[in-house]
Amino acid sequence: MAGYTLNLNIGDNKKRSESYSKTYQKRELEEMTTVQLHDICTRERIIKGITNTLNRHELIETILRFRGEKETLFIYEREEGGYERVEDIIKRKLGSQLRDEGTIRNPAKLIVYSNLAMSPNDRYQVEIDHQKRDGVSKAVVNHLGESNVLLISEDNELCGIFNLVSDGAENPKYYLAKSDEIPVIMAEHRHYYLMFFEKKESDYLYSAYYDLERMPAAVLNYYKVPLVEIEIREAEETDAILSIDFGTSNTTAGAYLDYGYISKPNEHDMLNGCIKLDDINLVTFNDTTRDDRPWLPLLPTVVSVADCSNPEKVKYKFGYDAQKETKIKYYDETFSVFYEIKRWANSYNAMQEIIDKKGNVTTVPRYTIIKKYLEYVIKTAEQRFKCKFKILHLTSPVKLKQQYSKMFKEILSEYVIETDHMLDEGTAVVYNTIANLIEKKRYYDSEYMQALIIDCGGGTTDLSSCSFMIRNNSVAYDVNIETTYENGDTNFGGNNITYRIMQYIKIMFANYYSKHESIRLDELIRIPAADIFRYVDEYGKDKVYEQLEAAYEEAEEIIPTKFKNYENHTRDEYFMVKNNFYFLFDIADKMKKQFYMNEGIIRNRFQSNYDDENEDLKITRIDRWNLVVKEKGRLIYHHDFPDVIFNIKEVELLLQADIYEVVNKFLNRFFKDGTLNNYSIIKLTGQSCRIDIFREALKEFIPGKCIEFKQHSNDSASIIELKLACVKGAIQYVNARKIGFTDVNLNYSMPMIPYSVTAFTHENEEIQLICSLDKVVTAGYISRNKDIRQLELILKDGYGKEKFRYNYRNEVGQYRPVTYKEIESMYKGYIYQEDTDNITDREVKFFVFATADQWGFYVVPITRTGTQLYIGKEEFFAFENDIWEVDFFDGTK
């Protein structure tokens, strides 16, 4: 069975010569237009495709004939009867042993875990020389590449199935890999071999294993190379705690591995530096979206649906694999892709419709998708560290600590979740600082320090304050930490910055394609850069972007991106517009990273190669240009790169008002009441905080004061380090508690709520029940007639703008008799006796209050009949939900 895959090179910053011939895969070519196929024929000098008039299908076949690359068919997922079918082939169809003459060299020793996968990260390299002289007369040539490999005994008995995997480099290295689903069965022999096959024979084994239709094969020729030693182990359960920072855009994980975390650590991994004992170990993930396939400590929080034909066994792809799937067709297929699943914390029991590429549709609970993603992270950690974790520590936003704790316990019930000592993300970052202060002995004993933490993540930005004290009591360090959530913006994060850049890009391209001219940003934002902060103070952020937003709406008529508006158009038009949004959002994100991950970039443009790059002009490399432009009412693809250049000064001007508005919203209260100077540490975390505008905005409130922000060069390593501060702090915290060096006392104060909750009286008077940014007024009540069936409550932001309306349904049949003592035991501090004593017979009082441990508010109704009090059902309403939160991927942008 022949098959094909696509290997895109989007975002690869490595400069390559364009002179070498590229190979193409059928799946990639099928996504291209006829114009693009002709361009390939010209670029690759495929004469038949240039001189002959060929249709699209003929062009694809011609390119595949001369530059085609078939995919590797790996045996990885277990299939009933597959192992036995391969055994049968070895017995019946094994042909001649080919001479390798030392061109294939196995690793000295294999350590295989029966209950774990083997990955290229294990670095079991098979060295392959594709042409080598035998020292006498003729050249020995093997044609080995990515393929299936069999582990056999000396009498050719099948013992296991492995994969030979390339690292993706131009001069590739090959590593052994193995699925955890396919067993290794050791025979009673001393000597074992790896049996290698060239592509044709390897594909035949694949087809046999999965019982697919295959061409008859007379014999299977093979290379047989001895193994010096192989050892089979079973991964042990460990007491080490796996810490996970489940992020909106990216997730990280790691553990502190001491010398006794398992009885027999993997010697091979320690030699290679993959496991470091008595140290923090971070889980690395293979970035399969890039040609060089690096191993990174970040996993994108993205899930795609691979196959939902069987609703009981839905197959998903996670992280980089999901991103790779989404890039293959730029979203003109109808399979489900989920971003920002962390936002589902308040609705994780809701049902979610999913669809795969073949059009199969089913529904699953949202918690299933979150669970599968987290299990993938855990499984990867177990594979990296060669153990089985039973104890997990998961950080969460400080304001949603209880909600996340509840969700994690429910969906990961087979693990022990450290909820009693669960750190929030801000405190984890601060503990990273505390641990470093203790290690370097730079703290003042028994003296309190105060810190402000601004965390600008992928989807949200939060402000929390933290006061801590370190005391050395001669037995251990006593660390007292008190944390308060101070403010936040659930709709501002790295994605907002990307979207703002996308708006500018779209406007620029719309002018280029419609008028063949560029437009300067100062024509869209007419306020000088030096006056932006003052202008926001006086008129607000929206006034700054008024003309830009209007120009963006006009650009929609030329480069449409609001694909939700095209649901009543043809399928092709819908996907062309959807392609536009994701294409522009993707390249905006790449340009953002280019500007803020590389020092000295002044100008930037998009191009397919680096030919025009110099010290002044940097290239954001895009493999192919796919932008749809509306011309005379028709949507037309454009594949030529536009001659448009962006500069850093314009991008900085573009983002100034957005970033200052958030910083002003967070710090203005502290600045006005004079408490800002009490903070000795101001910590900026999250990858978006690398942007200099954050620090410039902070200086507006902290004149002359040094902001404690670790200065790194703006390279990818330091950007990643910002994200790792949280998971490293969590690992240090759980390890310090485990070994008894530190006694940590955590306290959480009543959070500052950036929302108000109001309701209208029967006289149409609006009253505040919960006041914004007020720790005192966090409870109130409103009275209604006893027969009320529904109470409407209004949520407003700190500026008084309505965000959402809640409806509490008053179920008369659910009231029960109650005494005030019972009420006090349940709601002490929220419902007072004087407020229940004056309830009349025809009145029901709805008590509305927020608590320190839940990010939302409760509604509790109490009524009276004679002297008897009755209490109705308690209901919790979250402040934030996915109904009113901004979703950049909903087709309305």
Give the predicted meaning of each segment:
Residues 2-77:
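Basic helix-extension-helix modules of the SAP/HeH family
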Residues 90, 94-234, 619-624, 645-650, ...:
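Acidic low-complexity intrinsically disordered segments
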Residues 77-202, 275-392, 396, 406, ...:
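Phosphate-binding loop and its immediate beta->loop->alpha context
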Residues 231-264, 333-336, 342-343, 438-482, ...:
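Gly/Thr-rich phosphate-binding beta-strand-loop-beta motif of the actin/hexokinase/Hsp70
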Residues 259-298, 447, 474-487, 710-715:
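Flexible phosphate/Mg2+-sensing switch loops adjacent to catalytic phosphate-binding sites
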Residues 214-238, 421-454, 725-743:
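Conserved phosphate-binding catalytic cores of ATP/NTP-utilizing and phosphoryl-transfer enzymes
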Residues 370, 498-503, 507, 546-744:
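Helical "lid/coupling" subdomains associated with nucleotide-phosphate turnover
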Residues 381-388, 398, 404, 408-448:
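Hydrophobic, small-residue-rich alpha-helical packing segments that form membrane-like cores
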